[in-house]
Amino acid sequence: MWIERQAESLVRRMARQFPAVLVTGARQSGKTSLLRHLYPRASYLSLDLPAHAEAARSAPEALLAGYPEPVIIDEVQYAPSLLRHIKARIDGKRAPGRYFLTGSQVFSLMQGVSESLAGRCGVLNLHTLSRAELLGAGHGIGEQRYLYLGGYPELHVGADPDLWFPSYVATYLERDVRNVLRITDLPEFNRFLRACALRTSQVLNYSDLARDTGIAPNTARKWLSLLQASAVVALVEPYFGNRTKRLIKAPKLVVLDTGLAAFLAGFRSERELAASSLAGAFWESHVFGEIARQAANRGDTTPILYWRTASGPEVDLVIERSAGSLVAIECKWKEHPDSSDVAGLRALESAEGKRVKERMIVCRTKASYKLGDGTWAVSVADALKRLAAR
């Protein structure tokens, strides 16, 4: 059963404008399925197969000639030199919708695209399924269940999460680590994955992360860079205003799919996660993820930031609009926030003044309502509607 992706219209728009479209994202996020659903008559080449990747490196022109256009080329990071040959073909015939590329190593791919396909390629980052996409497809999944299960498509068409997640980590994450970083101590890397999951939505401290894993801080940086490049984690950068001097400058670490984070952290039921001390952090990661998904699916590259002073006041998420106005968002794992939950929002408003145009507490409320100071307590769905309207 096909679950409609919110990114479908953006892919079609890009294909009408650019000769090439690149869809990046975590492994198994649905990149190939999306393209094959939209373009069922396109020929298909997977560089995930070693023989095809070797042919792309050693005889690229012969390989490309064997696949009629339009063509979907999967996991193009295994032969980045192929991008130069695609560029040459595009320059010889500047027609839209010729090449559809996917890749699971974002940084290396973007470097190749900027060098070879600048101005010729539309780029979309595809996240795992949002809860909104699942609800739109008739999956009546509650927020607590989604928090535990996450959005990898296979899990919503019958896969057993107790079997799927261990296989995913072993097949994809560990393989990428072996191929890219030549790591041989996989149990050590698995401890690192667990440590990251336990720190989701926390300010990143490489020394603490390294110490708890038993590795050097530089190794922690290298491994985290790989997870970021693989779209497994995101680093949420701090917002620096003009009036506050002493701000936390380190980024926050967010595991982008809460289901993967729950598995890595050792939770084995949604009730266990909901009752744990980490529920609030997972909720914040969920809210960040839903906002990031909506933005990516719309082609919106506005950064999602956070704000925290050295003395304590914090705002979980800050979005700066093009005109310089700010949307300040707190994430609370509760149904009924009250005036005691707005301290961070008021501190940011005190620091930034009239630039703060909207304050929201995103919570588990069934119906949005306004607190006495003008802050709105809203559901995730309502928050997404408010952000989309601006």
Question: What residues fall within each predicted segment?
Answer:
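A cross-kingdom feature that marks ATP-driven nucleic-acid transaction machinery
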Residues: M1-E4, E8-S9, R13-A15, A20-V21, ...
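Short glycine-rich substrate-engagement loop in P-loop NTPases that contacts/grips substrate
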Residues: A42-P70
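Conserved catalytic/switch belt of AAA+ P-loop NTPases
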Residues: L83-F107, S114-S116
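Loop/turn-to-beta-strand initiation segments
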Residues: P19, P68-P70, A95-F100
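Interdomain hinge/linker elements that couple catalytic modules in large macromolecular machines
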Residues: H127-F282, H286-N297, T302-P303, T309
